[in-house]
């Protein structure tokens, strides 16, 4: 499957600006800056299980089916209902305050989120 795999974060751009625009408190932004994130994706046709494993043991998992409404949890911990779509090989979700896209480029998982003119990009390398 195109997205199935385990990916370790290797770089990010515009972290501080994006998290502040999301409304996260500065102490949370500071504390989260150097957290190691491993993303594990399991894709079975249109069904996805998308987990972020954070250093310290916290895990955030979202399960969704492309084109169907699902409950999704955001970076900030908020939960809401959304339809996740596949557009041109990218997984696309419109969160309440921002749009998020994910795609596989070679052995990299590239995640891009945009809010108020700021674009946050996280690139993770494939581990498995």
Swiss-Prot record:
PANTHER family: FATTY ACID BINDING PROTEIN
Entry note about domains: Forms a beta-barrel structure that accommodates hydrophobic ligands in its interior. Can bind at least two ligands per molecule, however, the stoichiometry is debated.
Tissues and organs where the protein is expressed, per its UniProt entry: Expressed in ileum.
Molecular function in Gene Ontology: lipid binding
Keyword Acetylation on entry: yes
The protein, known as: Gastrotropin
Gene: FABP6
PROSITE patterns cross-referenced by the UniProt entry: FABP
Predominant localisation class: cytoplasm
Protein task: Binds to bile acids and is involved in enterohepatic bile acid metabolism. Required for efficient apical to basolateral transport of conjugated bile acids in ileal enterocytes. Stimulates gastric acid and pepsinogen secretion.
Source organism of the structure: Oryctolagus cuniculus (Rabbit)
């Amino acid at each position: 499957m195109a997205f199935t795999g385990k990916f370790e974060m290797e770089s990010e751009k515009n972290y501080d600006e994006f998290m502040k625009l999301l409304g996260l408190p500065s102490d949370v932004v500071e504390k989260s800056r150097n957290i190691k994130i491993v993303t594990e994706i399991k894709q079975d046709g249109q069904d996805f299980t998308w987990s972020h494993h954070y250093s310290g043991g916290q895990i955030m998992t979202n399960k969704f089916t492309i084109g169907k409404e699902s409950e999704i949890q955001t970076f900030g911990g908020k939960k809401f209902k959304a339809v996740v779509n596949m557009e041109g090989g990218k997984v696309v979700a419109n969160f309440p305050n921002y749009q998020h896209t994910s795609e596989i480029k070679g052995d990299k998982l590239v995640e891009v989120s945009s809010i108020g003119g700021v674009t946050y990009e996280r690139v993770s390398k494939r581990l498995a």
